[in-house]
C-alpha cells in the first residue's frame, strides 16, 4: 500500500480506494495530454464501475485504470480478467442506454491504462463487445 507524508511529517497509509483514485487522476491527466477529452469518472451502474470515460474524436473511450508496484504476477495490464471485462461491458452498455445510445449506434472502445512501477502502458482497444 502507498504512503503519503502528512503535515506532521510522518507518513500515513493510503487506503486502497485512495490509491486507486490517485492513479485514476494520473491516468486522466496522461490521457488528456494525449489529446483525449474527459467525460466522466467513477461511473457506477448496476454491477460495475467504469474508472474513466473519455472522448477521442468521435469515439467514446471507456478506460480501466490499473496499478501494480511491480510486474511480479503479470503486472497491471494482466489483472484485467475476463470477468472484469464482462463487468465493464455490462456497465458501459447500461451507461450508453442512459445516454440514448448502444454499442450499435455509438463508436466506442475499451482501453486499459496500466501503471506498473514507474511505467505506463496504454492498451487501446484492449477488448470489445465481441471478446
UniProtKB/Swiss-Prot annotation:
CDD domains: PoNe_Nuclease (cd20736). This is UPF0102 protein YraN. The gene is yraN. GO terms for molecular function: nucleic acid binding. Belongs to the UPF0102 family. Residues 1-20 are annotated as: Disordered. InterPro entries: Restrct_endonuc-II-like, tRNA_endonuc-like_dom_sf, UPF0102_YraN-like. Signal peptide: none annotated. It comes from the Bacteria.
